[in-house]
């Protein structure tokens, strides 16, 4: 028992010794490792306060990249560095807006400058030794690999290949080490010469190993990475060689800084609405395509150096930092803000590279008002032979200023006589508000010559065929005073406008548009506002003889226009076909046909004007609505003469028939002339023939009569004839019956238009009473207000509605 206890005690002691020995060995290894890393950290070209705080992983990464950095450093000419260069080395990083980055062919970052912390938020030692692909956006990896790939060229071009230039666009690097929440910042990679990257092959003389073999060359890429600032973070004012611009999404200027004028020569207003591609040098257009593409994909870009065309020739070297501004509401691109750095003066000023640089396009035209005093200048005695036309021919732009406007006075000037020259210094042509002058001096002042503003001598031109010896000037004086003072030209010449030779008819009003412009008569009538006022008023004064030739009277043009919204199936004059006339009506109708259609009926060959006037008086005194009615009822209410939308019968197509035939099954109702007039007299009211001449208010007829009194088509007059017993029945049959038609296929209505002469004739015939001036819309829509005893009642109304439908 005791022996077993002794054995177990020995085992325990031995195990403790082994553990202690292992701890001592581990402690010794750690101490040795620490000593090794301490020595390695001191081997690094870093300050003691920096190297003493490095961890083992950082020391290993830095020591691993140190030989590569030494190779890059040995490739440079360090022996030629002066004392001044050594003093300025500390200021280079302060002046540099970015950081220096050295990449190997595999993408390892073997060196970064100390100021990388200001740009990326990561220290120099946290990034050194890592791969650049760990800190860039995945979308930029392929582009970076393409830049890092070195391709050997032919032997004769090997020297050029050793310094291969490649344009480097922007790339993005995240600014913290959190892999779950990365934030990227756009940086631009640029090389030491013209902002292009140089992939250099460093081949030292002592590049042989211990065995005598030559080491492979060290290939690396040295770039300068500059972060692109956001426009909101730019410090203002900008540099004197910098101007700001804003563009739309299609790269058209929407704003430009005024500093562009002194740098490039363009005015800001000249660039607005123009594309920025118009000002790129043709050789740089392809290089700028990719940066503009990256601008929309990454949000920011730096174009690198390119040539921008100057205004008057040549170009300047420019570098642009472009930023896409997004809408805060929908995150859509809104505009592009560019900060343009002009890097040089205008190069090759005499070289024209674009049509926009030509003087004929870009030189602004001087104002025409400035040239006006140069035209009206004094003619010296030795220059009298010089013609005014030659002066105006040298400056054709001034002729456009001399063209008159609507309403201007046209005053021809006589250049042959100068005896009656008078100074015009005291005569005010215009006052402060460009109104007619009220000076009395114009009444006694001739307006024929127009002198220079400061000289009393007028213009003279003896040989001036192109201007027809007239000069059009603009004057806003009293027309009566001006016309009275023109004593060198006739009244007709004074009122003729300045027109071409093919002008045939002069205008009669000096203030109308056709006085200054050769316009069509229909277009000119639109400008005559006084005629519009006359349209809504009746003038009892006769302006022209009451004469309407048959060939010029177009009934279709006289028909009222009815919109589609008001296109109801209303009764019109041609549907009132149930009335029948006796044998005396065709005779009267024949006389009216003879009066208005002289060339159509063969019986009018012996017609005379005296008979026509006598027949006209007889017809006006006889209140008869004469018409020839059709018995053939069309199927559709909108076809034929039944429809109110159908065109009236032309006079040339009408043939007067003196016989009337009734449709089979329709009884003939002969109505004497005196009873038919009684019906019309009964329907009329004294209020019917009273009207107002108000042009704004719509005139309505207060009557209970039919549509005969509506539009002045067909005349209804009052006579003292006793009404017949069948007048009410006959009138109802006129309004409601479609079956009682006459057999004629055409209808003729006597038209007495509401013109001035018609008003005068009616006033003379009926003791001052006149008919109301109404439109077709009033006739067919307005219903009688009172006198309902003559309206359809009961079964007759239902029968009329059935026939209308």
UniProtKB/Swiss-Prot annotation:
Name its GO BP terms in alphabetical order.
Answer: cellular response to hypoxia; intracellular glucose homeostasis; positive regulation of DNA-templated transcription; regulation of transcription by RNA polymerase II; response to hypoxia
Residue stretches making up the PAS domain: 85-157, 229-300
Describe the PTM: In normoxia, is hydroxylated on Pro-404 and Pro-560. The hydroxylated prolines promote interaction with VHL, initiating rapid ubiquitination and subsequent proteasomal degradation. Under hypoxia, proline hydroxylation is impaired and ubiquitination is attenuated, resulting in stabilization. In normoxia, is hydroxylated on Asn-782, thus abrogating interaction with CREBBP and EP300 and preventing transcriptional activation.
PANTHER family, per the entry: HYPOXIA-INDUCIBLE FACTOR 1 ALPHA, HYPOXIA-INDUCIBLE FACTOR 1-ALPHA
**What InterPro entries does UniProt report for this protein, alphabetically?**
bHLH_dom, HIF-1_alpha, HIF-1_CTAD, HIF_alpha-like, PAC, PAS, PAS-like_dom_sf
Does the record bear Cytoplasm in its keywords? yes
Task: Write out the biased-composition intervals (Basic and acidic residues).
Answer: 8-26
**Domain PAC: from-to ranges:** 303-346
Q: According to its UniProt entry, what is the function of this protein?
A: Functions as a master transcriptional regulator of the adaptive response to hypoxia. Under hypoxic conditions, activates the transcription of over 40 genes, including erythropoietin, glucose transporters, glycolytic enzymes, vascular endothelial growth factor, HILPDA, and other genes whose protein products increase oxygen delivery or facilitate metabolic adaptation to hypoxia. Plays an essential role in embryonic vascularization, tumor angiogenesis and pathophysiology of ischemic disease.
**Which spans of this chain does the record mark as coiled coil?**
none
Q: Which organism is it from?
A: Xenopus laevis (African clawed frog)
The gene for this chain is: hif1a
Gene3D superfamilies named among the record's database cross-references: PAS domain
CDD domains membership: PAS
Q: Could you tell me where this protein is found in the cell?
A: Cytoplasm; Nucleus; Nucleus speckle
Q: Name one GO molecular function term.
A: transcription coactivator binding
- The name this protein goes by in its record: Hypoxia-inducible factor 1-alpha
Q: Where is the bHLH domain?
A: 17-70
Q: What is known of its domains?
A: Contains two independent C-terminal transactivation domains, NTAD and CTAD, which function synergistically. Their transcriptional activity is repressed by an intervening inhibitory domain (ID).
**4-hydroxyproline: residues bearing it:** 404, 560
């Amino acid at each position: 028992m005791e022996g077993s206890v002794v054995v177990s005690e020995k085992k325990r002691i031995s195990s403790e010794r082994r553990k202690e020995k292992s701890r001592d060995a581990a402690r010794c290894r750690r101490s040795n490792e620490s000593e090794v890393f301490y020595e390695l950290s001191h081997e690094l070209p870093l300050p003691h306060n920096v190297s003493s705080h490095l961890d083992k992983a950082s020391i290993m990464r830095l020591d691993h990249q140190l030989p590569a950095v030494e190779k890059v450093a040995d490739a440079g000419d360090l022996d030629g560095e002066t004392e001044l260069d050594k003093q300025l080395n500390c200021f280079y990083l302060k002046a540099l807006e970015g950081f220096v980055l050295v990449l190997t062919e595999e993408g390892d970052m073997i060196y970064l400058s100390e100021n990388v912390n200001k740009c990326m938020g990561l220290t120099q030692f946290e990034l050194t030794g890592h791969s650049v692909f760990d800190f860039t956006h995945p979308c930029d990896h392929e582009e970076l690999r393409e830049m890092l790939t070195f391709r050997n060229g032919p032997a004769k071009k090997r020297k050029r290949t050793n310094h291969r230039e490649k344009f480097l666009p922007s790339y993005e690097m995240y600014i913290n080490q959190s892999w779950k929440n990365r934030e990227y910042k756009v940086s631009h990679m640029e090389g030491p010469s013209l902002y292009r990257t140089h992939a250099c092959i460093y081949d030292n003389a002592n590049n042989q190993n211990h065995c005598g073999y030559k080491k492979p060359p060290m290939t690396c890429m040295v770039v300068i990475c500059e972060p692109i600032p956001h426009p909101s973070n730019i410090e203002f004012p900008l540099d004197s060689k910098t101007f700001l611009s804003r563009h739309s999404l299609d790269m058209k200027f929407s704003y430009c800084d005024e500093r562009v004028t002194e740098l490039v020569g363009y005015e800001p207003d000249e660039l607005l609405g123009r594309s920025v591609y118009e000002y790129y040098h043709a050789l740089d257009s392809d290089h700028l395509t990719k940066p503009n593409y990256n601008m929309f994909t990454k949000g920011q870009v730096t174009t690198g150096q390119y040539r921008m065309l100057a205004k008057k020739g040549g170009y300047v070297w420019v570098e642009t930092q472009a930023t896409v501004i997004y809408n805060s509401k929908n995150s859509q691109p809104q505009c592009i803000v560019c900060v343009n750095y002009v890097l040089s003066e205008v190069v090759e000023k005499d070289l024209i590279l674009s049509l926009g640089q030509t003087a004929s396009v870009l030189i602004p035209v001087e104002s025409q008002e400035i040239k006006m005093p140069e035209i009206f200048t004094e003619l010296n005695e030795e220059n009298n032979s010089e013609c005014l036309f030659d002066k105006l021919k040298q400056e054709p732009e001034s002729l456009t200023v001399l063209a008159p406007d609507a309403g201007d006075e046209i005053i021809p000037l006589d250049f042959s006589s100068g005896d009656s020259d008078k100074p015009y210094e005291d005569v005010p042509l215009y006052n402060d508000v460009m109104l007619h002058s009220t000076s009395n001096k114009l009444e006694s002042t001739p307006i024929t010559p127009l002198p220079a503003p400061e000289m009393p001598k007028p213009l003279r031109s003896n040989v001036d065929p192109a201007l027809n010896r007239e000069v059009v000037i603009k004057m806003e004086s009293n027309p009566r005073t001006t016309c009275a003072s023109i004593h060198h030209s006739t009244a007709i010449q004074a009122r003729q406008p300045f027109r071409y030779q093919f002008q045939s008819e002069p205008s009669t009003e000096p203030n109308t548009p056709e006085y200054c412009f050769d316009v069509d008569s229909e277009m000119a009538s639109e400008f005559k506002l006084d005629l519009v006022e006359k349209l809504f008023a009746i003038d009892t004064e006769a302006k022209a003889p009451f004469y309407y030739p048959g060939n010029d009277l177009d009934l279709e043009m006289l028909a009222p226009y009815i919109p589609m919204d008001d296109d109801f199936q209303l009764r019109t004059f041609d549907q009132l076909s149930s009335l029948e006339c006796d044998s005396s009506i065709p005779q009267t109708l024949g006389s009216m046909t003879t009066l208005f259609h002289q060339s159509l009926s063969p019986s009018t060959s012996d017609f005379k004007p005296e008979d026509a006037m006598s027949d006209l008086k007889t017809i006006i005194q006889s209140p008869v609505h004469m018409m020839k009615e059709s018995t053939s009822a069309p199927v559709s209410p909108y076809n034929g003469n039944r429809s109110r939308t159908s065109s009236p019968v032309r006079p040339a197509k009408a043939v007067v028939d003196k016989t009337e035939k009734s449709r089979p099954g329709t009884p003939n109702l002969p109505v004497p002339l005196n009873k038919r007039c009684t019906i019309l007299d009964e329907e009329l009211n004294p209020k019917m023939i009273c009207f107002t001449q108000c042009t704004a208010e719509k005139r309505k007829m207060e009557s209970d009569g039919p549509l005969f009194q509506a539009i002045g088509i067909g005349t209804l007059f009052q006579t003292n004839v006793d009404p017949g017993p069948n007048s009410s029945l006959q009138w109802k049959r006129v309004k409601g019956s479609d079956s009682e038609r006459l057999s004629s296929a055409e209808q003729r209505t006597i038209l007495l238009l509401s013109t001035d002469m018609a008003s005068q004739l009616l006033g003379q015939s009926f003791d001052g009473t006149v008919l109301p001036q109404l439109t077709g819309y009033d006739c067919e829509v307005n219903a009688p207000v009172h006198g309902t005893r003559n309206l359809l009642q009961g079964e007759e109304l239902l029968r009329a509605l059935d026939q209308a439908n």
